[in-house]
Swiss-Prot record:
A GO cellular component entry from the record: nucleus
Stored InterPro entries: Znf_C2H2_sf, Znf_C2H2_type
Function: Transcriptional activator. Activates the gene for selenocysteine tRNA (tRNAsec). Binds to the activator element (AE) motif of the selenocysteine tRNA gene promoter.
Upper taxonomic lineage: Eukaryota, Metazoa, Chordata, Craniata, Vertebrata
Protein name per Swiss-Prot or TrEMBL: Zinc finger protein 143
PROSITE patterns: ZINC_FINGER_C2H2_1, ZINC_FINGER_C2H2_2
GO molecular function: DNA binding; zinc ion binding
């Protein structure tokens, strides 16, 4: 079906005087299809009801003006809680629906997704939504029709005088004007169509659909839910669902009910959905059935949603756009967008309940990490043999883990350089490209620890003294070597010693012997950084500090500052 719409903002908007001297706003929509007498009858006496979608756009449903009832329809719930209605039309009628597939949205509701490439649609009419398993689907918003209208359907070579319009009435002047327009478009219609139209090969039979706006004279009828709509009765909610099951799942967000419990090794964590439990169990079993198909990428993931997020690090796709005017930022996941929106609204819904603390956070992750400061919990353990370091945050474990691998997961979008640490990438972008844009961290999506034997086989530690050879190769102790990143972003060799007793070097011809006893009786980790000008900086870090912080401290020393260990 071809729908060429002239909307209210266009220059083709016409005003026709009504019987009472009022101006009737007329919007004209052309529909090209094979004319059918029976389907023509169904168009008489129809009106439209507007419903607002999540992004502020409007969708329309058909009413039968004779009895005020909705045509057979399906209620779907969008992610912001608003309801949209899908019109079901029998196969063979002119108003045919696209094939759709039922999918579950992240809040348990159901939407229907068309099997088609989203690239075939105007991207401004495509809305990204996050599904329950973390994958992304796209809702296409069809061409919009003005609110509170009556549809009139006529043959392109016919007249409008005999049309039935239900409660509405059209004066003779309006009918005359419409007939003139019908004659005009029947002549011009074959000359070409707009860029957004699909040309119907059959020119032998046409019909014209005219939408007459009645303004406030005919009030819009409220949407009526059908027998398949299930409403949440909790105060202030009112969300609608297509099945009782989806409503029940949603109600758990109010009750806190988590009937799915993990019984793996005394874990006892509980979840609101079976899918949530299934995903969690894989953290115990290590199962990662979803593998990245990108060439030279060997990462795999627990869920298809995690894989889809990771793939965006290769493609650069960011389908979730910030709705605030003038912002223009977009994100790889709907959750990151939701947290970002709170930077506009100032919302911080997660409050620390520790007496005397009073801090609040915009994201649940930051809140959980903060609470561990009070509890002392360090649930994230490095699995590399002999390391056993523990961390309060998953991201800290990820940052630590790169010291055991050759991985450089962070890429500069300006020059293509790669880095082990996100902080080093940020420093490089600031100094080399004057880019201060925050870098999103999504380590959990693509942190895949290497097997212990691969770590031992592939990584070695080099102990650096004053040697400044042309090939950059330094004297090694214990045959282990690890390449790290210096302050200026180039690759240099650094020392990471877990214990001062394991750290010693001998003097060389190129430089004096260094003393690595930084004071104090307690044996603490030391990081020695080799910078681009040949200077070595030894940084002693505390138990809570990471290699990232050592690099930051060394950077400040390079600039002539004297930061303390706790700085």
């Amino acid at each position: 079906m071809l729908l060429a719409q002239i909307n209210r903002d266009s220059q083709a908007m016409a005003e026709f005087p009504g019987g009472g001297g009022e101006a009737q706003h007329v919007t004209l929509c052309l529909t090209e299809a094979v004319a059918d007498g029976e389907s023509m009858d169904t168009m008489e006496g129809m009106s439209l009801q507007a419903v607002t979608l999540a992004d502020g756009s409007t969708a329309y449903i058909q009413h039968n003006t004779k009895d005020g009832k909705l045509m057979e329809g399906q209620v779907i719930q969008l992610e912001d809680g608003s309801a949209a209605y899908v019109q079901h039309v029998p196969k063979g009628d002119d108003l045919s629906l696209e094939d759709g597939q039922a999918v579950q949205l992240e809040d348990g509701t159901t939407a229907y997704i068309h099997h088609s490439s989203k690239d075939s649609y105007d991207q401004s009419s495509v809305q990204a939504v996050q599904l329950e398993d973390g994958t992304t689907a796209y809702i296409h918003h069809a061409v919009q029709v003005p609110q509170s209208d009556t549809i009139l359907a006529i043959q392109a070579d016919g007249t409008v005088a005999g049309l039935h319009t239900g409660e509405a009435s059209i004066d003779p002047d309006t009918i005359s004007a419409l007939e003139q327009y019908a004659a005009k478009v029947s002549i011009e219609g074959g000359e070409g169509a707009g860029s957004n139209a699909l040309i119907n090969e059959s020119e032998s039979e046409k019909k014209m659909q005219i939408v007459l706006s009645h303004g406030s004279r005919i009030p819009a009828k409220p949407p009526q839910t059908n027998e398949k709509a299930f409403r949440c009765d909790y105060e202030g909610c009112g969300k609608l669902y297509t099945t009782a099951h989806h409503l029940k799942v949603h109600e758990r967000s109010h009750t806190g009910d988590r009937p799915y419990q993990c019984d793996h090794g005394g874990c006892r964590k509980a979840f609101a959905t079976g899918y949530g439990l299934k995903s969690h169990v894989r953290t115990h079993t290590g199962e990662k059935p979803y593998r990245c198909s990108e060439e030279n990428c060997t990462k795999s993931f627990k869920t298809s949603g995690d894989l889809q997020k990771h793939v965006r690090t290769h493609t650069g796709e960011r389908p979730f756009k910030c709705p605030f005017e003038g912002c223009g930022r977009s994100f790889t996941t709907s959750n990151i967008r939701k947290v970002h929106i709170r930077t506009h609204t100032g919302e911080r819904p997660y409050y620390c309940s520790e007496p005397g603390c009073g801090r609040a956070f915009a994201s649940a992750t930051n809140y959980k990490n903060h609470v561990r400061i009070h509890t002392g919990e360090k649930p994230y353990v490095c699995t590399v043999p002999g390391c056993d370091k523990r961390f309060t945050e998953y991201s800290s474990l990820y940052k630590h883990h790169v010291v055991h691998t050759h991985s450089k997961p962070y890429n500069c979008n300006h020059c293509g350089k790669t880095y082990k640490q996100i902080s080093t990438l940020a420093m490089h972008k600031r100094t080399a490209h004057n880019d201060t844009e925050p870098i999103e961290e999504e380590q959990e999506s693509f942190f895949v620890p290497q097997p212990p034997d691969e770590v031992i086989k592939g990584s070695q530690i080099t102990y650096v003294t004053g040697v400044d050879g042309e090939d950059g190769i330094q004297t090694t102790q214990s045959g282990q070597q690890l390449a790290l990143i210096a302050q200026d972003g180039t690759s240099h060799v650094a020392i990471v010693a877990q214990d001062l007793s394991a750290f010693h070097t001998s003097a060389t011809e190129s430089g004096p012997q260094h003393s690595h006893n930084l004071g104090g009786s307690e044996s603490r980790p030391v990081t020695l950084l080799a910078t681009s000008n040949g200077r070595q900086i030894a940084v002693q870090i505390g138990e809570q500090q990471s290699l990232e912080e050592a690099i930051r401290i060394a950077s400040r020393i390079q600039q002539g500052e004297s930061p303390g260990i706790e700085d």
